[in-house]
């Protein structure tokens, strides 16, 4: 039977126009298709209400407010990237232009609430409004504001993030020297906050600390990479492991192998998500207590694994978007009991003034899906022991329970500050975990040589933290056969010799997910680097050993850079970790680079990291020069100011740095520095800046972008456009062939732009 015949065989008979389909909730089908859309989800769940009323986590007299807030849509929130020097300028632009335009504005009969700052977030860098994402996307009255949000989000200057999810990174108290592990990082909004805190001092291109962001889902790891890339940090590594058995890493310290313990750990575990009902309305019809019972064990294993890898004196934040004590206090109580005093709950009540929260509870009951309650483990019948575990109940020893101080946990209720529901607990490590006390902190070289390496697949499938600890204990004490030790020793020596961090040469179990390109550090004697060093007059302090590529064969097209600390992690753990991405792009090969003195041009992604080390080919430009460079495709030298022209005319062709320094004596001008990558051609100059970043700089300088569609090109006047007879055309042709050239700026012209400041 042919394909068409098969299709006709199973076709439904035609339905008369306007006839109702009972299977689709009474919707009618007309000529234009289904009318009325899908039936709305009823925001009711009797089991949910019965469960939480019985637990009494909502204060007396507030239940109706609590339920009413859950049925309301979640307000939109945004956070300004705090570490960037442009944060104040973005805040100024938001408050004095976009927010003012929202005053007295109505959309679909609803008055638009002017965004207000979150009272508990520092420096007014987080704001919320009653505008939902749907209204922002659909309303033409808000098109300009929506375009601003999308563009600035892509540039990494703004993050649209739920208010309560901003809390855990703030409570970690991150400092630039901290080594941080984000155990369940995707989609990455909290990870970006952690990166911001590492780069609090913009004058330091390479902080001593770093963030290792992990997620068990291989596909979500790439979403995580996209989020992290917006911040252009050399101190972030994305890895793909099961958080409950994430491998313990080692680093080289003065020739010795030391176990890597983290100063800060974010443990934002998978949960039932009943605190997200305001945005995930599916939870209303799918919620049962079975979700929490099934997740409790995984949550406890992840938290235990995090506690094992936390340094003494370090801080770990455990968080969920669930209000259920089985996922919250029960996990914390079980972890504290297992730690035997090694962990304690920190009192963070004064750390976020303005935040409203409820203290953790010390008594709760467990309910099954069919509504049966149990107050104690001994009440649970034998047939339910696999579903309900002892760790789901509060400790029976009242003295031990009081010593845990579960009231120090924070539970955020939706109706208190118009947010989602959330739970946070901050743990401090006072001593090694009881089962880790016998493990030596430092491994010598002979012990390391005997250490059997574990493939990432084995580590990712190990489910029990205690078993994992036992395995690591054997690894550290040197258990393993001599053949494995011999192979490991050879592998390590090869790693140090060629700097390749990729799959081991010996046959290993196949990893799941996509195969990643290797991370190959460039040897210090590589002939590729001296021309770069000479062309840009790099400072002697430039850490050239931190440069890497993603290929072992052929020409190196792109050079990336990581911090010294992440290089140490990569070189010593290549067989333990499945690394998805790390490093930022700092140089790209030119298509015809051999014609110039240097085959590599600068990449905008890494320019703020590289700039402190560059001593040549820097052109200081004015604000008007920046406007010209960002709104015209290939402006001739004569379009620049006399100061900039005098600098550029004597330079050889090739990549340049364009630097704008703010004038403090003129407060009406842009008050933050700008560093751009450019190309000095034969008679013209251009910038290599991505589209959204261009739009960002233009807005900060008071120019309004007029076009909205991506297909609208740069509006160039006749005097700006280079004709085929003009000398600038050769440069335009050269840059047009370069795959790294960014998109044009849509609908933006310096002459037509209207001031917004």
Swiss-Prot record:
Residues modified as N6-acetyllysine: 585
GO BP, sorted A to Z: cell division; hair follicle maturation; in utero embryonic development; meiotic cell cycle checkpoint signaling; mRNA processing; regulation of mRNA export from nucleus; regulation of stem cell differentiation; spermatid development
Signal peptide range in chain numbering: none
Active site: 321
One GO cellular component term noted in the UniProt record for this chain: mitochondrion
Start and end residues of each stretch annotated as Disordered: 1-35, 436-504, 716-757
Binding of S-adenosyl-L-methionine, residues: 184-190, 215, 242, 268
GO terms, molecular function: mRNA (cytidine-5-)-methyltransferase activity; tRNA (cytidine-5-)-methyltransferase activity; tRNA binding
Broad enzyme group: transferase
Crosslink position(s): Glycyl lysine isopeptide (Lys-Gly) (interchain with G-Cter in SUMO2): 46, 510, 515, 585, 639, 653, 659
Major location category of this protein: nucleus
Subcellular location(s) of the protein: Nucleus, Nucleolus; Cytoplasm; Mitochondrion; Cytoplasm, Cytoskeleton, Spindle
Processing and modification events after translation: Phosphorylated at Ser-139 by AURKB during mitosis, leading to abolish methyltransferase activity and the interaction with NPM1.
Record's keyword annotation contains Phosphoprotein: yes
Family: Belongs to the class I-like SAM-binding methyltransferase superfamily. RsmB/NOP family. TRM4 subfamily.
Protein name: RNA cytosine C(5)-methyltransferase NSUN2
Organism: Mus musculus
